[in-house]
């Protein structure tokens, strides 16, 4: 994992994560049923942004991208934050995404993946003792998540809505 220098805006892809220190910003696009997880150490001013697609890696035989899943991606990102000096007991979380992007279809067909992603992320964070400070979950529209590490502020851009700071 490379640490960006200076005041960069670092893109986080789908099924990926990035960690960085202040004054960098992390941004991820395309949060539909996916969930964006921001973890932040406000004392050290380091944090990460994870863009998960699925809740549980145990349903798959060969996991080549652990950041794709909540159960493997969150611990992986915490390890990277620790390498930057972050302390797990100080971490707080902010969440966005988990939408139902295919409304109108048979619910059995779409498997409520956004809802399942959100639930799994919350369960994992709870087990790890990480407090969720804010969330922008559910609905039926895509989101962009922008994490300003200097301030800890997360801005959510939702299609058809004004910017929201959480």
Swiss-Prot record:
Entry's Gene Ontology molecular function annotations: protein-glutamine glutaminase activity
A Pfam family recorded for this sequence: CheD
Functional note: Probably deamidates glutamine residues to glutamate on methyl-accepting chemotaxis receptors (MCPs), playing an important role in chemotaxis.
Transmembrane feature ranges: none
Enzyme class: hydrolase
InterPro entries assigned: CheD-like_sf, Chemorcpt_Glu_NH3ase_CheD, Cytotoxic_necrot_fac-like_cat
Annotated keywords: Chemotaxis, Hydrolase
HAMAP family: CheD
Family membership noted in the UniProt record: Belongs to the CheD family.
Gene3D superfamilies, per database record: 3.30.1330.200
Protein name: Probable chemoreceptor glutamine deamidase CheD
Keyword Oxidoreductase carried by entry: no
EC number: 3.5.1.44
Gene Ontology biological process terms from the UniProt entry: chemotaxis
Reactions catalysed according to its record: L-glutaminyl-[protein] + H2O = L-glutamyl-[protein] + NH4(+)
């Amino acid at each position: 994992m490379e640490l960006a220098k200076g005041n960069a805006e670092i893109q986080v892809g789908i099924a990926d994560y990035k960690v960085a220190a202040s004054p960098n910003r992390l941004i991820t696009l395309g949060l539909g049923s996916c969930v964006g997880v921001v973890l932040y150490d406000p004392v050290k001013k380091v944090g990460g942004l994870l863009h998960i697609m699925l809740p549980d890696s145990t349903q798959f035989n060969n996991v080549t991208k652990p950041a794709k899943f909540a159960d493997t991606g969150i611990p992986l990102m915490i390890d990277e934050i620790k390498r930057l000096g972050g302390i797990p007991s100080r971490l707080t979380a902010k969440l966005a995404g988990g939408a139902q992007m295919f409304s109108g279809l048979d619910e059995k067909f779409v498997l409520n993946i956004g809802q399942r992603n959100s639930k799994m992320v919350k369960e994992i964070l709870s087990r790890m003792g990480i407090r969720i400070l804010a969330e922008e979950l559910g609905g039926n529209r895509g989101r962009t998540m922008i994490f300003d590490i200097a301030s800890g502020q997360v801005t959510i851009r939702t299609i058809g809505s004004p910017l929201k700071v959480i």
